């Protein structure tokens, strides 16, 4: 069996329920890629003896043994090489269980906002998973829940290993930074079907690849032995544990239940930014101070005139903080 082919997918379930689902998907051959290229489906039991102990590939068993969730991450799709994990879960949303995750060792066309495309090498944790929501008003906020779960997962794994915490920060709306350099990002897309929003969440996190910026282990390698460095599988398992807890709080109590922790983790409290406001035919620039988030997920800021404003990106800049447009509340 050639599991190194670019269109090979390996299915692995946490329990007999997910294992039966994997077998059914393989037998029915229903998983497809957006370009309709041929897909080879394998079960984890078929390939486990072909993976070497020193293999740098994602360790499926290590991840699955770390999972203690009830819904998320219990059904795994893994591939050594994919164009996009996000495309796999979004294109097959109706075929796979809600909460399924797709992981790839190498990703050539990872999806970013405004159709940006990212190439991700080995050592980067690249995954996409699915969830369902009914209230469209809070769907835009799910990216903040995901961002927070990633930072808290890294913190938990560091604590368990006795390591000093890598201080990963959130740059609004969906980037992750370490020591001033971008090490990750989140993308959420959704479609509406049968009165539900079908949300596909994509995450990329530099764990063990120092290019193109830096990574989590680059900060740790000088202070701990290689055997104690962070592993992608451990971080992903910790992420789903955190996310499931945060998601339940979010759905029951709203984002207010997570705001305090989120604001301790993001980079922007008290940040002064330039916002633009159209005044008849002129564009006026004003300096405002970021206070937090509005109920719709945009930036809440206060002007020097003590008036509260909601800040929106203009959509024309790669940096969200260039070209902010303000709207009086």
Curated annotation (Swiss-Prot):
In which tissues has expression of this protein been reported? Answer: Highly expressed in seeds. Expressed in roots, leaves, stems, flowers and siliques.
Keywords attached to this entry: Cytoplasm, Ligase
Asked if the record carries the keyword Oxidoreductase, the reply is: no
A GO molecular function annotation here is: biotin--[biotin carboxyl-carrier protein] ligase activity
Q: What happens when the gene is disrupted?
A: No visible phenotype under normal growth conditions.
Indicate which residues the UniProt annotation says bind biotin.
84-85, 107, 111-113, 182
- The keyword Transcription regulation appears for this protein: no
What are the EC numbers?
Answer: 6.3.4.-
Under PROSITE patterns, the record lists: BPL_LPL_CATALYTIC (PS51733)
Q: What is its main location?
A: cytoplasm
Q: Which domain of life is it from?
A: Eukaryota
Q: Where in the cell is it found?
A: Cytoplasm
- Would you name any one GO CC term? cytoplasm
Its GO biological process terms?
Answer: protein modification process
Membrane-crossing residue ranges in chain numbering: none
Q: Which family does it belong to?
A: Belongs to the biotin--protein ligase family.
Q: Which PANTHER family match?
A: BIOTIN PROTEIN LIGASE (PTHR12835), BIOTIN--PROTEIN LIGASE (PTHR12835:SF5)
Described purpose of this protein according to its UniProt entry: Seems to have no or limited implication in biotin-dependent carboxylase biotinylation in planta.
Name of the molecule in the record: Biotin--protein ligase 2
Taxonomic lineage of the native organism = Eukaryota, Viridiplantae, Streptophyta, Embryophyta, Tracheophyta
